[in-house]
Every structure is written in C-alpha cells, then in structure tokens.
Amino acid sequence: MKILVLNSGSSSIKFKFFDNKVVKASGLVEKIGEQNSKVILKNVLNNESFERELMINNHEEGLSIVNELFKESGILADLNALDGCGHRIVHGGRNLSEHCLVDDYVLKEIDRVSIFAPLHNPAHLAGIKTMIKAAPSVANVAIFDTAFHRTMPDFAYMYALPYDFYDKHNIRRYGFHGTSHAFVSSRAASLLEKDKSELNVISAHLGNGASVCAIEKGKSVDTSMGFTPLEGLVMGTRCGDLDPAILPFISHLKGLTIEEIDTLMNKKSGVYGICGYNDFRDIEREIEQGNDKARLALDMFCYRLVKYIGSYFAVLPKTDAIIFTGGIGENDSLVRQKVCERLAHLGIELDFELNKQRISGERMINHANSKVKVLVIPTDEELEIARITEELISN
C-alpha cells in the first residue's frame, strides 16, 4: 500500500511516504505564510533532494507543491495514487478515543476539542481538509496521540475535582505521546521475545516534551501527562507537575494574566527556566564548566523521572523492562545512568560500557544479571501511523 503520513503544524507540514511499509520519501513544508517559505522532498533511497523556495500562503498551496515534487522526483505519480493518508492528531478528546477513518463527524469533533489543544488541533484539521481537497478519492485516517491511553482505568484518569467538570466539560487526564509509547512497547515485545499481551514495561519518551507510560499486558494503565502535555515530568521548557495554588499566587505577585501564566509554564519553565538552556548537550557542557544551575536543572529532570518510574513499579504487577526513547532517551547516556543508578534497589543493573556506546538502533544496555531489562529503542511514530492507517483502510 502507498501511504502518506502528514504532521501538520501551524506554519509547517512534515511528511513521509511509505510504499509497502518502506520509506521512499520524506520532507517538509516550512514557514507557511512567510516570504521565504520552503518545500523539501528527499528520496530516501538515493538521497536525492528536490526543493522549492517561494511564498506559500497556506497549507493548500504547500501540499500542492509537495504533489509537484512527487511528480518531478518520479516517486509518486500523483497524490491521488495514494491508498491512504495518515494524520497525526494531538488530541482526540473524550469521544474520539480510537484511531479512525475521517468523516464529517470526525472533522467536527477534532474542531470541537481544539479548545484542549489550541496550538495543534487547528493545524492538524487544516492538513486533513487540504488533503481531502487535493485528493478526494484517498482515504484519510486520524491517528490520535491520546488513543493509546484509552485503556487507563477511571481512577487513573480522573482528577479529584467536582465530578461535573468531567461529566459536563470532559476535564480528565488524556495522556500524550501515545503513538510513540505504542511503537516502542511493541518493539520491546519483539526484543524480549514476549507476546504483547504478556508485556509489562515502563516507557520513557524523553525529548523537549517528555512523558512516562506504565504499560501492563501491552496496554497503557497510567501516564505522566494529563489534560494537556504540561503535566508530569520536568521538560525542556515546560514545568511539569506544580502546586496549583502557585498560579493565583504568581498572578497576584506579578500581575500576570491567565494567558501570560500559560506561556510562562509552557515556554519559559522546565530546565530552560532553571538554567537558560533546554538542549541537554548544552546543559551537560555547562555542568562540565561548573555551572551550578545547569547541574540543578539536570538533577531536577532526572529526579522527577525517577519518581515517576518508581511509582509505576508500584502500579505494575511486575516490570519486565524500562524503555528509553526520544532524542534524550536514545542519545543521552548520562541521563540514563543517573536514572538507573537511583533505581538499582528495584533490580535494575546498568551495564555502564553498553550504556556509553554511541551506536544507533535498538539495544539492551543492562547487565546480564539485571532482574529488569533496560532497553534503548528509537521511536518511529511515522511508521506506526503508516501501519495503523494501512490496517484501518484494509479493514
């Protein structure tokens, strides 16, 4: 099957093209709405690139140029030749709890729950509508970051607020990074030679946004992100868990509006708020140069991560493995070491030499005697989206 995967942002479109589950092309439309917009399509098989630089006013114009580059490259005759298009959608809300084929109801519901993800869902919706217009005969599939967490029990996803806030306004914990957690847990089952239905793992997706997921018998039973991706771990620029009473206090102290506080928590906090850096390579370089705030930021990040992983040991009946994924999880040996050392009493023995090896790909980095395996698994959300898209279209 020929499947296109789209991740539409407010001013960009990232895409990958799969032919029979093999990546044939990837690319990006960037700076939509600006004078110096750019479209890049790369033939993954021979590394040949095709580019356009011109003013792109909207997503529709951007996708039209992507179509031109597909034709020029010879990779795809036309977008209408696709069997399906999978769209990454951050938030499905309460009603769209599973991945699904797009119809009028789905479009309206994605729009309705945009209030939960105002930075993401409107752009995703624009991407879907653009694709429908460009290739009316192609099936579109909505893949929700929240869907993997639909199996959380009510006592895990409810907030201890008056019940009406859930019943009437759908305020609950939804969780995110679901496509990534689903992909790496599936790969872990293969690596550990276990059936997914018997797999108990803790998945840590660590990037600029970060979350942990407790997976019991292959299903999500708890996760660190909540109603929004702000809850949970200390992140690149997000504060994570916070005493809610701090918000009105800050508002009175600094005279900030709700919108300004939201920006403060999402874009000016996390490790960046502590030390001025959100790239962990910069943070670790600063630590080597004696920057105490950088040391504090790293310690806070790792400590919160340890607390969440430790709590999920208590949630799961047993734990087969911890999975590290995402840019930091896959590449930062110091973070993995600091976390695993603090969890040693739970049966985790890291092999320090394996951990330090700078190699890509899936690998096991625990000592042979470790009761709990430690896995590094590069995530591939686009491949997972393509797989689900193909599955739903076939059925």
From Swiss-Prot:
The active site is at residue 145. Mg(2+). Can also accept Mn(2+). Its cofactor is Mg(2+); Mn(2+). Its main location: cytoplasm. Homodimer. Catalyzes the formation of acetyl phosphate from acetate and ATP. Can also catalyze the reverse reaction. This is Acetate kinase. The gene is ackA.
